[in-house]
Amino acid sequence: METMPNWLKQRAFLTPDRTAIEIEEEKVTFMQLHEKVVSVCEHLTHVGVNRGQKVAVLMKNGMEMITVIHALSYVGAVAVLLNTRLSREELLWQMDDAEVICLVTDQDFEAKDIPVYSFAEVMNGPKEEASIQEEFSLREAMTIIYTSGTTGKPKGVILTYGNHWASAVGSSLNLGLRDDDCWLACMPMFHVGGLSLLMKNIMYGMRILLVPKYDADFIHKALQTRGVTIISVVSKMLTDLLERLGEGTYPSSFRCMLLGGGPAPKPLLETCVDKGIPVYQTYGMTETSSQICTLSADYMLTKVGSAGKPLFQCQLRIEKDGVVVPPFAEGEIVVKGPNVTGGYFNREDATRETIQNGWLHTGDLGYLDEEGFLYVLDRRSDLIISGGENIYPAQIEEVLLSHPMVAEAGVVGMTDDKWGQVPAAFVVKSGEITEEEILHFCEEKLAKYKVPKKACFLEELPRNASKKLLRRELRQLVEEM
């Protein structure tokens, strides 16, 4: 199969009156969404957007962003999705790197070298008949999303129509589909996790309740009253929701809490079991079009810390020095599947280094147990090497989070004259606790060389728009000490 019918157009034909998107009190059917997208196409065509061009999108979650993303696929342009939290300089660099022909935005932004189109101004301007793709070629690029740049400059990950299709199919085979499914979308759509929900929305014909920005109070209420069956979260969001739930429970129709961004502490999972909240832990990245592994809720306590097994059409193995290692041996996580990117835009060297014989070398460290369950230890770039010993920040963070007075924790390496590196901890308190008490608590639960040499208190930890911990900012704080 090399082509498919235009996804949204086909969905509007099959189920025109079914609700596609809910935002606050607004409801839009698939046919209404299609009509909105055609209108956006006609306005974008007038300003010169054509097939094969790359168009930057700098917008917040909302109906406008949804219609722009679909409109670019309708005309055959590639959407370069930009993170709204980046600085102007970072955004200009990414647009230059991606060779975009213009920027479409809902924000105030100026750029000397490329046209900047305000969405509102474009929609108030003239229309021109658009050439709409009736079919999508699965090999063609649909989106470019930049990696966070944990090592060096960010790289533009090219994701094809085929990658997005395979990701949605793999997720449905994993989680199943129900007629009444509604996915609450609170992740930014400029991240692959948020974008993937737009793909599932039109492929499954599934209703999405879109939250323009993260609001724990609204989300908690929506889970109780809006018929939500699935939500994607990270540990911080899950903690926020459990705090609001208190002694209560969510409706029995709520069937899946899809947890990404790293393993959750066991006490958190035990609370979810007590309250009947099915947590599916996942592992994925931009390069895999969202999740590539999932741990079923059936195993959430018996396989604590595991990200599960690969999706049906995907493969995973652990390598060290180019050799596949046996169970429990630590090494680099290497993955393969139709949802995996073919490479980075204008980065041939990085593509060759990362993707070898179809296998993507993730840069993450982990191991498989005897049953093939994946355990992610850490980013290779986050590894702390102290006196020749490997220390995984995630392990120390798990210990810190098990203390009742610790709400959030982040660990990074700091330079040490004797050991090369030693761990340093950053903590957000949920009650009264001293640095000495934290370090003593760690001494009781960790090998001596893993105990943080310093614990600093912050009002909040630095996180990205998906609420993932930004270790690089913690490393900067360490350097400033």
From Swiss-Prot:
Chain's role: Converts 2-succinylbenzoate (OSB) to 2-succinylbenzoyl-CoA (OSB-CoA).
Record-given protein name: 2-succinylbenzoate--CoA ligase
UniProt keyword terms in alphabetical order: ATP-binding, Ligase, Menaquinone biosynthesis, Nucleotide-binding
GO MF term set: ATP binding; o-succinylbenzoate-CoA ligase activity
Catalytic activity, reaction form: 2-succinylbenzoate + ATP + CoA = 2-succinylbenzoyl-CoA + AMP + diphosphate
Matches recorded under InterPro entries: AMP-bd_C, AMP-bd_C_sf, AMP-binding_CS, AMP-dep_synth/lig_dom, ANL_N_sf, ATP-dep_AMP-bd_enzyme, MenE
Keyword Nucleotide-binding: yes
EC number in record: 6.2.1.26
